[in-house]
């Protein structure tokens, strides 16, 4: 779901999940983990992009509807952790949309 490649001194993190990279618990946890690994490795500049025709459609609302309150109880913390990991990434970070 998350692909990372090095281009020169820049890390390129690509969301690659389904047709439109909709964010579900699994993608968000993988994103949080990948950002943590990059930070621990001392990586510098980061470009975040999406595979396919969309950067990201946002939260996967179909999964929210299907999973109900139990799914939402896991989604909100995963979303918060992913946002915090992105906001706290120490290097310059840009989104290639």
What feature does the model see in each segment?
Residues 1-49, 84:
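Conserved CoA-thioester-binding segment of acyl-CoA-metabolizing enzymes
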Residues 24, 72, 95-96:
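A generic secondary-structure micro-motif detector
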Residues 49-50, 97:
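Short beta-strand/turn micro-motifs composed of small residues
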Residues 50-85:
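Glycine- (often His-adjacent) and acidic-residue-rich active-site loop
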Residues 83-97:
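Glycine-rich beta-to-alpha active-site loop
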